[in-house]
Amino acid sequence: MNRYKQVLNFEPVDRLPITYSYPVSPDARWQPFPNRYIYQNPAVMFYNELVSAWDLHITDRALILDDLPVTIRPNWGTVTVASLLGIPPEQRDDQTPWIRRRDENITLEDIGSLDVDIREYRWIQNILETYEYYHEVVAAYPKFGEMVTITLPDLQGPFDTLEQIMGEQLFIDMVLEPERVKESLLKVARLQKECIDLFQPYCTEQIPGYSHQHGTMLKGNLLIRNDSVVMISPRMYEDIVAPGDIFLMKEVGGGAIHSCGKIDHATDVMFELEGIQSFDLGQSYLNDMDRIYRKAKEKKIPLIRVQPDREELISGSILERYPTGVTLTFRSQSRDDAIQVHEAYKRAVERRRKK
């Protein structure tokens, strides 16, 4: 954890912290249950969190000896806040839950008139029941409880949540009624804050100002997902979407922003937001990372889950590109491949230290 804190504060570090993702081998000792069962039994959800969450494997941590933290979350998908906006989530077979929009679209007027008591909603109750089970297990196994961090669930962000409910109409409304969209996003942000306040007492984050999501440590107390920003201009983000993000980050005492895809068109605007403390990339390789890193270093905003290529790791050149301020994740072919790459990475770090 100390290595993470050093990197997240742009301090000198022996090496960049790294995690390894890979598919579960058919002959692996620990096999995840099919996804459908995690929604039927909290013990299965708990087990799968340890065996294979985001293709990260806490059960292999002692073999790889990487920097994977031991974290578990109520894994009820991306629909928790969206479930409060008028459409119940659906879940079938091994798919993750989703929102199926109705034939009659939900409008900005519908969002504005909503009066929600979040405790009455089934998805909120599901998460609370999962938290309660997790705490029963931790209480029964106190040594494990000392190791594990129970985190917030995936609450998305105001823009991604409203997009789930409204679909393409949201983007039309952003052009025709930008102020009403901004107000709707702020309403969704307030609902998200209610969820945070309800779930936070169940979380066991140990260091104020830092939290865990996506199998890694962040600087900030909340991760706002902003995948849908890849589809809008920086100006639209700044004028319409950012106020909701700023509200949340101020309310929680600082936060992080996440986006998958190619997001470098908007990072300059995001790095100026009040309250932003780190930035998580789902697909760093799609972006101009050298330009992003220069700006991040200037603003002291650490970059989370940058994905190096194999040669950068085994040669150690990744440390020349990013001396600090970056955490890494590497997509391996298998557990054995992860072990080999990590050993090569550590040898490269040691060679550089001796120069």
Q: Where are the regions a protein language model picked out?
A:
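Aromatic- and acidic-residue-enriched carbohydrate-binding clefts of CAZyme catalytic domains
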Residues: P88-D110, M217-M231
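A short glycine/small-residue-enriched secondary-structure motif
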Residues: P23-R36, N75, P97-G112
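Outer-membrane beta-barrel proteins
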Residues: M45-Y47
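N-terminal accessory alpha/beta regions
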Residues: L56-E90
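Active-site loop segments of alpha/beta catalytic cores
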Residues: M1-Q40, A53, H57, L65-I72, ...
